[in-house]
């Protein structure tokens, strides 16, 4: 069976990917989420429960809070880099940390494929793809939501 790591948040897009890739496409799906400080323990447990309901073979949560702070957040605070003069401009950098952690995990389990649920809109897809291609050019990227141009309703159905 083809081993695939799925960047998994537990939302609609990544839940669709888990079902589609495991049941329809026959991948051995290993779901992984990266906590950079946005999840509580109970939320991580919910994400894990949902991942298994969606048919994944394994689920792993990577705690990257300390890495995110030491490599990103503290510099945003030091530089007073704010979005709309309100909060640290951290989301784009957060995706980079998440992508690095996910691809390193994929390499550690010898995955042949990696997938994410980003749509064709926005920059998250670029951040994930760029890091994945740079750090593991031999691992094939699969993006069902973007490639199949699915609507939210199609994902639910």
Regions picked out by a protein language model, each given a short descriptive name:
Residues 1-156:
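ATP-dependent adenylation/nucleotidyltransferase module used to activate substrates
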């Amino acid at each position: 069976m083809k081993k695939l790591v799925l960047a998994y948040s537990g939302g609609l897009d990544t839940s669709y990917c888990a079902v589609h890739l495991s049941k329809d496409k026959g991948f051995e799906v290993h779901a992984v989420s990266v906590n950079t400080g946005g999840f509580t323990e109970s939320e991580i447990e919910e994400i894990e429960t949902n991942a298994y309901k969606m048919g994944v073979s394994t689920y792993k949560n990577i705690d990257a809070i300390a890495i995110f702070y030491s490599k990103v957040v503290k510099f945003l605070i030091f530089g007073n880099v704010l979005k709309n003069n309100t909060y640290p401009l951290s989301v784009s950098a957060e995706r980079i940390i998440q992508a690095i952690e996910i691809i390193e995990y994929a390499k550690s389990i010898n995955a042949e494929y990696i997938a994410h649920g980003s749509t064709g809109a926005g920059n998250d897809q670029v951040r994930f793809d760029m890091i994945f291609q740079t750090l593991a050019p031999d691992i094939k990227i699969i993006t069902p939501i973007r490639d199949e141009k699915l609507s939210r309703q199609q994902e639910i159905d």
